[in-house]
Amino acid sequence: MEKRKRTIRKLMPVSPYDSAGLEAWFSELAGQGLFVRKTGYYFANFQRKEPGSLVYKLEPCDQYRDEYEKELTEQYRLAGWEAAGDVWRKFIIFAAVR
């Protein structure tokens, strides 16, 4: 039996600035068992796990985000979300169970 890769790299179907498009794409792939971890300019890396029903939210941030990121991540955590990665260090990716 062939062993399946745990990390998958996919070409992003929309611009990294199309946050609604990326959120929908990430949610669709989570249903197939691929969970976003990191993105580059054109590609996104996913970790393979059991399929799940997640909703994603991209929150804009800037390159000087350390304090802001800590505060924002804590606010999202209290609301039931967890940080899942980032897009170009311009957006923080949050995920929550649908």
Language model region names:
Residues 1-98:
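Terminus-proximal functional modules
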